[in-house]
A protein has these predicted regions:
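Assembly/interface hotspot detector across virion components, adhesins/toxins, and nucleic-acid enzymes
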Residues: 5-7, 54, 59, 111, ...
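Gram-negative bacterial Sec-dependent N-terminal signal peptides
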Residues: 1-4, 8-52
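Extracellular beta-strand/beta-solenoid scaffold signature
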Residues: 67-84, 97-117, 129-144, 158-181, ...
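Ser/Thr/Pro-rich, intrinsically disordered low-complexity segments
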Residues: 53, 85-87
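A generic structural signal for beta-strand entry/edge sites
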Residues: 13-15, 65, 117
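Low-complexity, glycine- and small/polar-enriched segments
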Residues: 48, 52-54, 75-79, 151, ...
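Right-handed parallel beta-helix
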Residues: 71, 88-99, 119-131, 148-162, ...
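Short N-terminal segments immediately surrounding and downstream of signal-peptide cleavage
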Residues: 10, 55-72
Length: 385
């Protein structure tokens, strides 16, 4: 059943949002973002005080996704304009410059309850650029805060957002190109290439609740961050993550987790996945698992590196009480660290258990294959060095 919604500029969030027509208000009387199934909004080139045009545009929404919709948004001074086009189940967004996002992102997807699902399918999002202009606000290309966001066969390419200078705190600024903050996230058959953001070059998951992340049959190539998580950043002790049949290659981070940063995340499962030629400045050329339990099966780490003079764990860095990494099958080949643990570094109470794993040609100043420091239980079964 179709429902009618209205495009409204939310001045406090600095973004266009789609709201239930009955509850909407463009006079700032507390617009409520209630959407039966899917909400899409975008703003281009708008500062925090600029007002967008065409706030009365009506769109139709079905139970699963927006259909046959074109919405144009312009700044007061016509610095830039942008276009959302959703044709059937196909989404195409490209060549957009956003000069000043606040809390909201370019595409703000909201479900009316935790049971609802928002789906992006069969499309591309490319060449977005911009920056967040306010401390502690976290714009992204796509933001989801409730329900479940599904991304199916979508390409995100060359979307780049500037870092906000807020002292030494790495957690301010643009969090991922995809940001799930309190929402479940499912990514399937999708590609993330050449994206840049502050925490998580492609995906950021940040939750205080029981949420799930599922990434399957997807590719992450050449994504980057100056901070943590070159491709993916996940935090939240109750967030359960599953990664399967994925490829992470040539992603980079200035600090930790060249491909994947797990920062106090919940239980994480990685299966039939390859990490190759990823690089981090300090900890975990491919994966940094801090305070996180990871169970891996048939995972390959090849040619990853912790590149700085203080580089630890060319492929994998596992840290902290309660943290653990187990792997059955797979290999660590040609990984390197400038300092400790050419393939793996385990420290400060973290556990490591490997079975049927092969190490070959890994290098470091100390511990060419594995280096430990005040680690918990470390076991190797049928493992080749």
């Amino acid at each position: 059943m179709n429902s009618t919604f209205k495009v409204v500029f939310n001045k406090a969030r600095g973004a266009l949002m789609v709201v239930n027509e009955v509850t909407s208000s463009v006079q700032g009387k507390g617009t409520k973002t209630v959407v039966a199934a899917a909400v899409a909004a975008m703003i281009a080139g708008v500062s925090g005080s600029a007002m967008a045009t065409e706030t009365d545009t009506e769109i139709k929404a079905t139970d699963t996704a927006l259909k046959a919709t074109f919405t144009k948004a312009e700044t007061q001074d016509n610095v830039a304009s942008s276009l959302i086009g959703t044709l059937g189940d196909k989404l195409v967004l490209k060549n957009v410059t956003n000069k000043g996002m606040y809390a909201a992102g370019s595409l703000d997807l909201t479900a009316s309850s935790a049971d609802n699902v928002v789906t992006l399918k069969n499309g591309s999002v490319s060449n977005f650029s911009g920056k967040v202009t306010s401390t502690n606000h976290f714009g992204a290309v796509v933001t989801a805060t409730t329900g479940t966001l599904k991304i199916d066969n979508v390409t995100f390419e060359n979307n780049k957002f500037d870092e906000v200078k807020t002292g030494d705190n790495p957690h301010n600024g643009t969090r991922g190109i995809i940001r799930a903050a309190g929402a479940n996230l499912e990514v399937a058959k999708s590609t993330f290439a050449g994206n840049e953001a502050v925490l998580g070059g492609a995906i950021n998951v940040w939750s205080n609740g029981e949420n799930t992340v599922k990434i399957t049959d997807s590719t992450f190539t050449g994504n980057a961050t100056k901070s943590h998580g070159g491709a993916v950043y996940i935090t939240g002790s109750q967030v359960e993550t599953t990664i399967a049949d994925a490829t992470f290659s040539k992603n980079t981070s200035g600090k930790q987790g060249g491909a994947l940063q797990l920062a106090g995340a919940g239980e994480t499962t990685i299966t039939n996945t390859t990490f190759s030629e990823n690089a981090a400045g300090t900890f975990g050329g491919a994966i940094n698992a801090t305070g996180t339990k990871v169970a891996a099966t048939n995972v390959t780490f090849e040619g990853n590196k912790a590149a700085s003079a203080d580089g630890h764990g060319g492929a994998l860095f596992v840290d902290g009480q309660g943290a653990s990494y187990t792997q059955a099958g797979g290999k660590f080949v040609g990984n390197s660290a400038k300092k400790n643990g050419g393939a793996i570094r385990v420290q400060d109470g973290a556990d490591l258990a490997l079975k049927n794993v092969v190490f070959d040609g890994n290098t470091a100043a100390n511990g060419g294959a594995v280096d430990t420091f005040n680690a918990g239980a470390v076991t190797f079964t049928d493992t080749t060095f």
